[in-house]
């Protein structure tokens, strides 16, 4: 198995993000995929989100930002919740009617216990096996896909480095698989 890859093909990304909504309906899994793709959070941070982190129960509305302490780095991160993420959260919230202390991505049998990383991996792998041609897809692909498309949309390198907490843009390019894409273009465009 190779290095985890982002989902580069836009149609495959569309199919991947909607699999648990349209093909095999399961709102928890759908929300996991959509939130992962739209926040660039590591799976450990996604799985530790509680409903009170994304929904203000006093004001009865979704929050505009997530404030988390990253599990891996211990750093504080303040992340805007975009409309796609809010829409997925809304659908799941309406189905679940959760308590503020429940985990957003909880076990089916106990909403006060987070989904395991291995179960999250199985959810992502099942989705990818039906929707993408890329074999090296894992939970980390959600984060890499966010970065890959941010790069494609022209997000400044320094900002991407900041989002991923990398010390150099070279590391960020390698992390997102951009370095290989650029190298491939050189070979594909030189036809002697």
What do these predicted ranges mean?
Residues 5, 71-90, 102-125:
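C-terminal catalytic core of Y-nucleophile DNA break-rejoin enzymes
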Residues 9, 15, 77, 177-192:
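DNA/chromatin major-groove-contacting recognition/catalytic segments
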Residues 10-39, 43:
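Basic, Lys/Arg- and aromatic-enriched nucleic-acid-binding interface segment
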Residues 20-23, 122-158, 162:
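Short, basic (Lys/Arg/His-rich) helix/loop patches that form interaction surfaces
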Residues 35-48, 153-155, 166:
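A short, glycine-centered helix-capping/turn motif at helix boundaries
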Residues 48-76, 83-85:
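Conserved tyrosine-mediated DNA breakage-rejoining catalytic core shared by Y-recombinases
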Residues 49, 75-76, 112, 129, ...:
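Catalytic phosphate/metal-binding cores of nucleic-acid and nucleotide-processing enzymes, i.e., regions
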Residues 54-56, 156-176, 181:
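Short, polar N-cap/turn motifs at the start of nucleic acid-interacting alpha helices
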């Amino acid at each position: 198995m190779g290095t985890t890859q982002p989902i580069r093909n836009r149609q495959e990304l569309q199919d991947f993000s909607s699999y648990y909504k349209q093909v095999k309906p399961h709102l928890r899994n759908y929300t996991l995929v959509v939130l992962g793709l739209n926040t660039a959070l590591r799976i450990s941070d996604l799985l530790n989100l509680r409903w009170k982190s994304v929904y203000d129960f006093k004001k009865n509305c979704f929050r505009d930002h997530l404030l988390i302490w990253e599990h891996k780095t211990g750093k504080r991160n303040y992340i805007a919740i975009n409309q796609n993420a809010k829409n997925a959260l809304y659908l799941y919230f309406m189905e679940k009617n959760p308590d503020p202390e429940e985990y957003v991505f909880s076990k089916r049998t106990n909403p006060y216990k987070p989904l395991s990383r291995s179960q999250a991996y199985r959810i992502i792998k099942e989705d990818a096996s039906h929707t993408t041609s890329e074999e090296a897809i894992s939970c980390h692909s959600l984060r890499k896909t966010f970065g890959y498309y941010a790069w494609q949309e022209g997000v400044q390198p320094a900002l991407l480095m900041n989002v991923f907490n990398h010390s150099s843009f070279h590391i960020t390019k390698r992390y997102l698989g951009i370095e290989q894409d650029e190298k491939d273009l050189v070979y594909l465009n030189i036809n002697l």
